[in-house]
Amino acid sequence: MAIVDDDPRIQELLGAELTDLNQPHCSYSSADALLGDINNSQPGLIFLDVLMPGMSGMECLKHLRQQSFGGAVVMFSALNDAELQQQAEQAGANGWVLKAALFDDVETILRRYLTQS
């Protein structure tokens, strides 16, 4: 499992939630860092922030799908933007969660997407 967000607080909070649920994970502060390590870490599920400096989460998602990454990718954002959600879905995202609801939905996300992997 991987967490990709430029905000270390989100990495820490989501990481703690996953640790509490006995889910091993890696955290990355950029899309480039994830893509550079994807073959080593081989996560079954990626929590991917949409808006990050450098390569955006959306561009990262496109790279992952072009590289035939078969795991689930759940995008998250502070923005409740229907157009961005549609773009993410078209690019191959498995889900979309608002950051405000992310921590409440972690168990549901794990049940839904880890069983599909």
Where are these regions (language model features)?
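Active-site beta3 strand of CheY-like receiver
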Residues: 41-47
